[in-house]
């Protein structure tokens, strides 16, 4: 099973390589790369099953973010796991934001990786039908409200602008926190910004 690791932290590279080898992946099938251009070439050459990327490798350059977005779209059978570069926050969850794109904390546990990658590791094949997770999506109201929330508007302001009760705003905020698996506003904002960077944003149901 071909895999690619794009992370400038040698500790993370070592940890991921060790995990993959312990699960039966051969060392020669693990490719370390450093730049987005190298990633594009490696994905074309190896058709990897899984790619691990630290967002720090692309998030600071809009053209790199755009290229990552294109690479993810061009390789629908590859699972891309993007690690959030967020410090001093306890968050060890992961979210499927597209069929082939997971956003994850770097604190993800080996047994969580086993759950995600088990079938891929066994079958040595693409991801079709193997990730048994719901894709993150918000209702249209939740999506609009989240944007206002991120602009710094409070519950009362959102309530006035959307012409709904403050209690309803609080209820929607609770739903958003549940779906993104955290009560931490910093993590929620980070997930939204990262998703915006490498996709067209979190799915919003049009009803």
From Swiss-Prot:
It comes from the Bacteria. Residues 131-196 form the HTH luxR-type domain. InterPro entries: RcsA (IPR030866), Sig_transdc_resp-reg_C-effctor (IPR016032), Tscrpt_reg_LuxR_C (IPR000792), WH-like_DNA-bd_sf (IPR036388). The keyword Transcription regulation applies. GO terms for biological process: regulation of DNA-templated transcription. Residues 155-174 bind DNA. CDD domains: LuxR_C_like. Disulfide bonds: none annotated. Keywords: DNA-binding, Sensory transduction, Transcription, Transcription regulation. GO terms for molecular function: DNA binding. Interacts with RcsB. Component of the Rcs signaling system, which controls transcription of numerous genes. Binds, with RcsB, to the RcsAB box to regulate expression of genes. Belongs to the RcsA family. This is Transcriptional regulatory protein RcsA. It comes from Salmonella typhi.
């Amino acid at each position: 099973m071909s895999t690619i690791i794009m992370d400038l932290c040698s500790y993370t590279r070592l940890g991921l390589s060790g995990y993959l080898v312990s699960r039966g992946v051969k060392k020669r099938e693990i490719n370390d790369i450093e730049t987005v251009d190298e990633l594009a070439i490696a994905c074309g050459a190896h058709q990897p099953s899984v790619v691990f990327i630290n967002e720090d490798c692309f998030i600071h350059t809009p053209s790199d973010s755009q290229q990552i977005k294109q690479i993810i779209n061009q390789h629908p059978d590859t699972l891309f796991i993007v690690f959030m570069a967020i410090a001093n926050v306890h968050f060890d969850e992961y979210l499927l934001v597209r069929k082939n794109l997971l956003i994850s904390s770097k604190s993800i546990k080996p047994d969580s990786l086993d759950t995600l990658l088990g079938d891929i590791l066994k079958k040595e094949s693409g991801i079709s039908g193997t990730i048994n997770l719901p894709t993150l999506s918000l209702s249209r109201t939740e999506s609009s409200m989240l944007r206002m929330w991120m602009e710094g508007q409070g519950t009362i302001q959102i309530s006035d602008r959307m012409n709904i009760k403050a209690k309803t705003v609080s209820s929607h905020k609770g739903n958003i926190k549940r779906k993104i698996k955290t009560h931490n506003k910093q993590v929620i904002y980070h997930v939204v910004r990262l998703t915006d960077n490498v996709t067209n944003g979190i799915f919003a149901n049009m009803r």
